[in-house]
Amino acid sequence: MISLESQVLERHLHLFQDKSILFAGGINDDFPQQIRQYAKSTDIWSWYFDYARTQSAVSFSVVSDKTADLIVYYWTKNKAEVQFQLMQLLSKAQVGQEVLIIGENRCGVRSVEKLLAEFGEVGKIDSARRCGLYHFQLQKIPHFDLNKYWKIYESEILGDLNVYSLPGVFSANELDNGTALLLSTIDTHIFGDVLDLGCGAGVIGAYLKKQNPKTKVVMTDIHAMAIESAKRTLVENQLEGKVFASDVFSHIQNKFDLIISNPPFHDGIDTAYRAVSELIKQAKWHLKDGGELRIVANAFLPYPDLLDQYFGSHDVLAKNGKFKVYSVRA
């Protein structure tokens, strides 16, 4: 089953005929494989490891150095992410580069005309499945400097810890309330091997490492920008730790004394529980005897039942009007 966006693109297969094509953005299906019979070649650039690991010929990286006759960009709801990716792609292109931009109307794809007007001609060529399809031709190559996209934030809660983040990373500009509540439960008595799963910019793992220098911290995420951000957060604060891509536990083999997380519950603009459900269901296999899983979540989410199902019972370490910090032990 292909996405609504790909269903619209399917109406325009003649545009792919005998061209080298680079797919980018929020693509999440196997449409590139399905059109290989029409195209000269297909490549995919994705920031999302959960997608990249299930598809062939996907480049999982912060920036792309690939070129193609036609770029097909899948719009996402994260405006900072879209702006970064399109500017980076166009900075590597030649004048005359053709781009198709497809996205759901509810994700704000209409704003593509304003975003790209300075750099060429853009116009809508189709509207269906609650999506808009736009054609763009490059006339002015944008300047792109990765360093200008870095954001740094501080917080009284974090002490002298500085957090570095790139576009598209959760809570990229400030410490969010859920993470702040989770950090309030971290003391100086944590030891051993620690996994910060879904690390984002690395604030949880870095804060924990700073409070407990003898711990061995591993941080993982599915988002390329999060991984790059977490690595820099560690380096800039002179902290040691391992950071790598993993779709929940897909690339994690070790067992830990503590698995800690502010897990995502938004997938695009829909609420999704897959990652959190997998985290809770599989955590016991990645905890040492007596090891702890500690997560923060919106109080309305049905995680207590799931925690009790797989661990027998749970404790609430902290709560406020919106969030709760849950703890279970293997």
Task: Describe the role of every protein-language-model region.
Residues 93, 252, 286-287:
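A generic alpha-to-beta junction signature in SAM-dependent methyltransferases
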Residues 81-156:
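N-terminal auxiliary segments of SAM/dcSAM-dependent transferases
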Residues 70-80, 197-202, 256-269:
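Conserved proline-anchored active-site loop of SAM-dependent methyltransferases
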